């Protein structure tokens, strides 16, 4: 994250002896980009390197839909099966070397495994459900409309209080956009959200012994390891790198007399993509405004939108839970009669919630996307 935070008990100085109840605590530097990036210091009851058993390695190559035409896509996640596990069995739909977009439907209950994504930061957008996120940093309660942002390398698990549907983004260097931060890391006036909107982890320490199964994910697969001490044995931590949650309903959308580009709603930025959030807001209010998106030839980008709730005015035939992929080089925009209908909406409010991922690198669609794809969608501007 962008500001300093601390939880639990800490020594007065870093890298010094820290005793608790007569026992030496084990300090871990949890950091990005070697020793030059953001980091936190965690203090464990036990060495975090302690592995009791090395388990199974399972490869995990995303199957590509190799004969897919280069066209727009509409995917209906309502047709997807349930995931047996949110980490091992999430369903990858759209991907490239630096981005994976997945969806997961998970039943109520506790996950039996602990997770650690070694290669990618993760964003879980909670389309529906209630979840208790548990990690080495502590716990965060998340619910419908929340983003849960997890730095790569974080050890965590999830407890589902209700059946849940999750739109999942994996990528490198997912951060709060630099334009929102001043030189001290504080979110500036006019940014899409403020520091106090973020839900931060509350530390809970587990001093327990047993058999704990941890799955480490890389781009190539999953490695299972077994531990004899609980991985959440942290008694205190501080720093600038930790998970957090943010509700889309706490966002502060920028509106204008004339239509604002999607980048006005940038929520997170990564190496090769941005995440934008369309939330309920005032439509454009110039007396001659066209309060709907213009036609767009996004030559250098691929645009993925997840439609969560409300009415997305520029689209027809879109249901909650649908995903569209608008290809770079193909023009996209409002469907027939949508522009005319929007003219009566000047100065009124919309109720849409949608998540947009725009990437600068071409994406592939998976074999799972093929199963839920609407092949008529590219023609919908002609046939609507």
UniProtKB/Swiss-Prot annotation:
Fe cation binds at residues 296, 302, 332. The keyword Oxidoreductase applies. The keyword Transcription does not apply. It holds the Pfam family HgmA_N. Its EC number is 1.13.-.-. Keywords: Dioxygenase, Iron, Metal-binding, Oxidoreductase. One of its GO terms (molecular function) is homogentisate 1,2-dioxygenase activity. It comes from the Archaea. GO terms for biological process: L-phenylalanine catabolic process; tyrosine metabolic process. Belongs to the homogentisate dioxygenase family. This is Putative dioxygenase SSO1533.
């Amino acid at each position: 994250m962008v500001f300093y935070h601390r939880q639990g008990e800490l020594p007065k100085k870093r890298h010094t002896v820290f005793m608790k109840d007569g026992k030496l605590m084990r300090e871990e530097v949890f950091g990005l980009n070697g020793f030059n990036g953001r980091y936190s210091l965690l203090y464990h009851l036990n060495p975090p390197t302690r592995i009791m058993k090395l388990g199974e390695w399972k490869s995990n190559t995303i199957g590509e839909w190799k004969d897919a035409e280069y066209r727009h896509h509409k995917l209906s996640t309502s047709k997807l099966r349930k995931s047996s596990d949110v980490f091992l069995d999430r369903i990858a739909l759209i991907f490239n070397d630096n981005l994976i977009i997945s969806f997961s439907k998970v039943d109520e209950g506790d996950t039996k495994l602990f997770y650690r994504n070694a290669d990618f930061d993760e964003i879980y957008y909670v389309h529906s459900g209630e979840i208790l996120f548990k990690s080495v940093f502590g716990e965060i309660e998340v619910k419908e409309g929340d983003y849960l942002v997890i730095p790569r390398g974080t050890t965590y698990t999830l407890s589902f209080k209700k059946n849940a549907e999750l739109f999942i983004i994996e990528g490198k260097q997912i951060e709060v956009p630099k334009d929102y931060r001043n030189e001290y890391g504080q979110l500036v006036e006019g940014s899409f959200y403020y520091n106090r909107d973020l839900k931060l982890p509350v530390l809970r320490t587990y001093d327990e012994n047993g058999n704990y199964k941890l799955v480490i994910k890389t781009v190539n697969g999953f490695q299972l390891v077994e531990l004899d001490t609980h991985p959440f044995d942290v008694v205190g931590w501080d720093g600038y790198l930790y998970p957090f949650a943010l509700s889309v309903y706490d966002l502060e959308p920028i509106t204008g007399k004339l239509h604002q580009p999607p980048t006005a709603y940038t929520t997170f930025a990564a190496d090769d993509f941005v995440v934008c959030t369309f939330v309920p807001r005032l439509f454009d209010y110039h007396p001659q405004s066209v309060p709907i998106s213009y036609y767009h030839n996004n030559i250098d980008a691929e645009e993925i939108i997840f439609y969560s709730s409300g009415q997305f005015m520029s689209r027809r035939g879109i249901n909650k839970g649908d995903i569209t992929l608008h290809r770079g080089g193909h023009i996209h925009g409002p469907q027939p009669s949508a522009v005319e209908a929007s003219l009566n909406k000047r100065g009124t409010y919309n109720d849409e919630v949608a998540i947009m991922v725009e990437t600068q690198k071409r994406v592939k669609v998976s074999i799972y996307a093929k199963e839920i794809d609407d092949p008529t969608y590219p023609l919908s501007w002609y046939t609507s």
